[in-house]
Amino acid sequence: MHNINHLLNTLTDYGIHNTGKIFYNPSYSILFQEETRDTLVGFERGTVTKLGAVAVDTGIFTGRSPKDKYIVRDDITRDTFWWADQGKNKSDNHPITQAIWNELKTCVTQQLSNKPLFVVDAFCGAHSNSRLQVRFITEVAWQAHFVKNMFIRPSEEELTRFHPDFVVMNGAKCTNPNWKEQGLHSKNFVAFNLTERIQLIGGTWYGGEMKKGLFSMMNYFLPLKRIAAMHCSANVGVKGDVAVFFGLSGTGKTTLSADPKRQLIGDDEHGWDDEGVFNFEGGCYAKTIELSESDEPDIYHAIKRDALLENVVVLPDATVDFNDSSKTQNTRVSYPIYHIQNIVQPVSKAGHAKKIIFLTADAFGVLPPVVHLTLEQTQYHFLSGFTSKLAGTELGITSPVPTFSACFGEAFLSLHPTQYAEVLLQRMQAAQAKAYLVNTGWNGMGHRISIKNTRAIIEAILHEKIDHVPTFNLPIFNLSVPTEIEGVNSEILDPRASYSEVKEWQHKAENLARRFIKNFEQYSDTAVGALLLKSGPEL
């Protein structure tokens, strides 16, 4: 797509008129120049840091706004989508009518008309047979920078054949004046129309809405083709052994998959088809709160020119204070995946997964650091998706909150959770993969399990040193827990040992078990769910 006149006509078709200069797939140097211009004000303007990366602020929206997520309910989505207003569920897919959509679209297209625009064409998905060709349209340079970092950058030759089958229009500066009359949550919106294949953004500057919006779309299209869509990081060893790490934001997906002894496939979103595991993205979106070079060298060294920092505190001398959470706990950096040295090249994909790791951050101090799951327990804990929401990843979350997130990514699911569990199970059985629950949360004394111990546990899983050690059964949860792991202090393996009295653990465990049981009631009316009840905790 090099014909600007054709591009102008296409923008007109979208409803965007009288466009000024178009920056089409701008280089990083042009983006750097445009996002740091002295004439920019407010959230548009980036600050150059000593590390070389540009830092931007996103205002009050330092995380996603799930209550402002809307899907047009029409003939395509009516019977397939997992709706917020149907059944016993916690879906974020709030339905809107075509009429409301039309008003939101007018709001965004008017905002994007009569001004210079940045247009970025990119791929979502490393496999050509299942990827989306996505066009991003924004008036803000750093938002174009963000998607250039996060999605797969087409070659010049691929751009000549690029025909978008999904469009994202980011009108962060506009808000919806009629939201009360329309019965919506607020003046801000992140809306999708699968018939028109468009995403609209208004009112929120948070970059992650573009990233996670496309993830929700991949989570719709792929499982319907029997391709697993997974909220996970993934890496591969020298022998071609693939491991995937499921987990919500802040549980360790990015950190634990950045392993100097293994090649990174990707840090957050993947598919699993007949050929193996593949990345949806071309970049990483890592949390930076309390980031240090010694603990996370790969991520630290990725923060350089072309990386984009979000909501970090930049000191007067341009130094970044990664320990300062005054803006948000959810400080972030996006960077192209090649900023990590040890990556799968030239395409972010590998073979079938052999190790499936569910990461959970247990704020109760009940679960052990690691458990080898049976096939039935794998399904139960995948559908439960227990973790704690960590500070700042969503608007209003300021301290750890115990929660259940189906498939470790409930906020991004477009279909019913059982459909993802079914496809994942099929892929696991075909590949003879094993699953483990790894707790990166807190013990009974309120101390978080150290990254050193967690890395040693992951190492033992990957090298199959955990499969043949003695185990004990943890009551209530009926989990098989190893008594020893090489490189790990054995005292931390039994969560009861971190309490002065076992009955303290017992009380907390019973409390948490009741939460598991109550949460799983939403699946008990299905044949699969009823069979899995015995694979969870019992009182």
Curated annotation (Swiss-Prot):
This is Phosphoenolpyruvate carboxykinase (ATP). One of its GO terms (molecular function) is metal ion binding. It is found in: Cytoplasm. InterPro entries: PEP_carboxykinase_ATP (IPR001272), PEP_carboxykinase_C (IPR013035), PEP_carboxykinase_N (IPR008210), PEPCK_ATP_CS (IPR015994). GO terms for cellular component: cytosol. Monomer. Binds 1 Mn(2+) ion per subunit. ATP binds at residues 212, 231, 247-255, 296, 332, 448-449, 454. Pathway: Carbohydrate biosynthesis; gluconeogenesis. Keywords: ATP-binding, Cytoplasm, Decarboxylase, Gluconeogenesis, Lyase, Manganese, Metal-binding, Nucleotide-binding. Involved in the gluconeogenesis. Catalyzes the conversion of oxaloacetate (OAA) to phosphoenolpyruvate (PEP) through direct phosphoryl transfer between the nucleoside triphosphate and OAA. HAMAP family: PEPCK_ATP. It catalyses: oxaloacetate + ATP = phosphoenolpyruvate + ADP + CO2. PANTHER family: PHOSPHOENOLPYRUVATE CARBOXYKINASE (ATP) (PTHR30031:SF0), PHOSPHOENOLPYRUVATE CARBOXYKINASE ATP (PTHR30031). Its EC number is 4.1.1.49. Belongs to the phosphoenolpyruvate carboxykinase (ATP) family. It is an enzyme of class 4 (lyase). Pfam families: PEPCK_ATP. The gene is pckA. One of its GO terms (biological process) is gluconeogenesis. CDD domains: PEPCK_ATP (cd00484). Transmembrane segments: none annotated. Its main location: cytoplasm.
